[in-house]
């Protein structure tokens, strides 16, 4: 069998990793082994945290909705139940945005939900 020379492929693979490690401090941006470890870890964190971000934002929205709901004499769970009964299909992101930017609009929605609970 003929000998396989991998100079070009190996260099291209190493350069790809070093390019991803650009901007890292010290040896992590210069040495292939350190860069490989740093890039692997960074990509794992990025993958994980893209999912964690969704959880964090949902928790933030719920906290904001709950605070505004309590100002209107409802708990979060009763507000959501009332909205479902009133067939008001607003998601948590929009409700939280309303609670922060348009308290009067949120109060109107909360009153409709409250009316459905009576």
Curated annotation (Swiss-Prot):
Q: Which InterPro entries match?
A: Ribosomal_bL20, RIBOSOMAL_L20_CS, Ribosomal_protein_bL20_C
Q: GO terms for CC? A: ribonucleoprotein complex; ribosome
- Which keywords label this protein? Ribonucleoprotein, Ribosomal protein, RNA-binding, rRNA-binding
Q: Name one Pfam family in it.
A: Ribosomal_L20
> Biological process GO annotation list?
ribosomal large subunit assembly; translation
What are the coiled-coil residue ranges?
Answer: none
A GO molecular-function annotation: rRNA binding
The UniProt similarity line reads: Belongs to the bacterial ribosomal protein bL20 family.
Q: Which HAMAP family match?
A: Ribosomal_bL20
Q: What's the protein called, per UniProt?
A: Large ribosomal subunit protein bL20
What species does this protein belong to?
A: Syntrophotalea carbinolica (strain DSM 2380 / NBRC 103641 / GraBd1) (Pelobacter carbinolicus)
């Amino acid at each position: 069998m003929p000998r396989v020379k991998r100079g070009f492929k190996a260099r291209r693979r190493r350069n790809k990793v070093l390019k991803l490690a650009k901007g890292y401090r010290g040896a992590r941006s210069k040495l292939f082994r350190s860069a490989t470890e740093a890039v692997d870890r960074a990509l794992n964190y990025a993958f994980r945290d893209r999912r964690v971000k969704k959880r964090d934002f949902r928790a933030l929205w719920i906290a904001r909705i709950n605070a505004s709901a309590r100002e209107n004499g409802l708990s979060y769970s009763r507000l959501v139940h009332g909205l479902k009964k009133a067939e008001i299909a607003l998601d948590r992101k929009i409700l939280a945005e309303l609670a922060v930017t348009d308290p009067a609009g949120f109060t109107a929605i909360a009153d409709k939900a409250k009316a459905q609970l009576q």
